[in-house]
Regions:
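Detector for outer-membrane/organellar transmembrane beta-barrel domains
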Residues: 107-179
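Short loop/turn motifs that connect adjacent beta-strands in outer-membrane beta-barrel proteins
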Residues: 14-23, 56, 85, 89, ...
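Sequence/structural signature of outer-membrane beta-barrel proteins
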Residues: 31-37, 57, 62-70, 93-102, ...
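Membrane-embedded beta-strands of outer-membrane beta-barrel proteins
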Residues: 48-50, 77-79, 116-118, 154-156, ...
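Outer-membrane beta-barrel "beta-signal"
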Residues: 158-160, 196, 202, 225-237
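Residues that define the transmembrane beta-barrel architecture of outer-membrane proteins
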Residues: 22, 42-46, 71-75, 110-114, ...
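Short glycine/proline- and aromatic-enriched beta-strand/turn motifs that initiate or cap beta-hairpins
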Residues: 14-67
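Transmembrane beta-strands of outer-membrane beta-barrel proteins
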Residues: 25-31, 51, 60-64, 80, ...
Length: 237
């Protein structure tokens, strides 16, 4: 989900498998709690990722498994294409806390959500990123009336550096009622994600490109009158 606490700060390094422009990268994060777009999804979690890149195309598998007994499990697949400052994406978002949420169910009861997105980096001198995501399919994509919601999310964010610390600040909004997706109540436009991220990575000497990082995310959700402080470790290969 899209989304990724450490990935917002630390890029995934490419590893040895390179052939005709194809490369692979991966890693895992350990987080004190898992928040997606300002909304709590689970407690402490392990979040692995694997990316294959070929030219301007990339395919990423990302997951999250809760350490507690809540049963929360997530598996996302994202296909992305970068066209200059614009990145277009299609993602299959699958998360479940119930035994009857079967992965290979794609009918009206499907626990999957199919989301399309677009992100635009304004310029190198002004590295603001404007992003829009909309869910097109999924049983849970409903508004308070039970109608298809086409749940959408808009975010404006900007990375910057303070001495040797990588920072990122931004705000995320929901433009219309998406009660079943974001659990922020029966309302239309609202701000649900105001965040400030900070992190730093180090190379592991003698480990052939391995990196370790530490990050913190301060998250406000005005729609829920909530605030959270998340910390974690990032491992990249």
């Amino acid at each position: 989900l899209g989304a990724l606490a450490a990935a917002a700060l630390f890029g995934t390094n490419h590893v040895a498998a390179r052939n005709e422009g194809v490369s692979f990268g991966g890693g895992s994060d350990l987080v004190s709690s898992y928040y997606w777009r300002g909304v709590r999804e689970s407690g402490p979690a392990l979040q692995p990722a694997l990316t294959m890149t070929a030219g301007n195309f990339s395919v990423t598998a990302w997951g999250s498994v809760d350490f507690s007994d809540s049963g929360y499990k997530e598996m996302d697949l994202t296909l992305a294409y970068q066209l200059g400052p614009v990145t277009l994406s299609v993602a299959d978002l699958y998360w479940t806390g119930h035994d009857d949420d079967r992965y290979f169910v794609f009918d009206s009861r499907s626990p999957h959500r199919i989301e399309v997105g677009a992100s635009w980096v304004v310029s190198e001198k002004l590295p603001f990123t404007l992003s829009w995501y909309t869910i097109l399919f999924g049983a849970a994509d409903r508004n308070h009336k039970g109608e298809r919601a086409y749940a959408s999310y808009f975010e404006a964010a900007c990375p910057f550096t303070v001495k040797t610390i990588d920072m990122k600040a931004g705000v995320g909004m929901v433009p219309w009622n998406a009660a079943a997706t974001y659990n922020c109540g029966d309302r239309d436009f609202y701000v649900q994600n105001v965040f400030l991220n900070a992190g730093k990575t180090w190379d592991i000497k003698g480990a052939d490109g391995m990196k370790i990082g530490i990050f913190t995310n301060l998250i406000w959700n005005p729609a829920l009158d909530d605030v959270n402080f998340v910390g974690g470790f990032s491992f990249r290969m």
